[in-house]
């Protein structure tokens, strides 16, 4: 395997492995609820445990990655992921699962700063937007894997056994993955001072907060909502897999498209408007109209999922957002904060209303319009 290809594989896996647990909860949610003996809304607290911790750590993830360097940062990412999957297989009960997922928050906080730093170090400028789209598609590769393979593994080995199968690739990447990064150099001084976001980064963080709320709510409860409409475990896995396939296509194709636009904020706005339509279609599903579930899942994959990759590409290419690693860490604070807040909030109204996530998407649309004005303001011109 060539060095360029191996670099792209490691970047994709660095994004995929920590996020796989999120899509696993969406896919295996009905089995987990039955086995753990907890109410359905408690699934939301599983997601909050991992992404809440990730959001907190993301405040310092950028400076930490700059201090560690990309090689040590990758090693910490993959080893913490392997530790999380080990604990998930070994610890009993609901709170054991909460602890295991919390450990995975370390890897999730590191993923974007480490991969963005590695891209800045190893990828030529003309290829950066495409590589960002590719590595961000790793998140949807995990959705595809979770939907296509985990239901079958869970039927044979149980949901814990299915997730334990992920330990082997995590260990292999922990040993081999960091070698793709440059050799460690002398460490820079470590500063734990939380950087203040620029005006444009603050607005983009707010948009990503809204996107995180919506995506986490949608994926966490899609499985149990579909089960309530009479869908089988295999069909639910197909929903998540389809969501993942559409997300991969959207991230790979739309990120370079956004890079060619004068201002990607307009692309964000269009995608978010379409995402609100996809959520509305999902809400109309009944036991006799499963096609609406498919339309909603595929639509969310094509629209809302791509916005995070576009946002990361904006941060990496536009110096007005700040240095790559710290600004990516701050952007992750917003995104992961939304992931932490969304499931418990939606759990309170689950089964009664889908208007909460639709309203949050429309709020993100308004913020996208604000971002276009901020980037066009005098002294804040978009840098390409």
Residues covered by each model-derived region:
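Extracytoplasmic gate region of multi-pass secondary transporters
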Residues: 25-26, 200-248
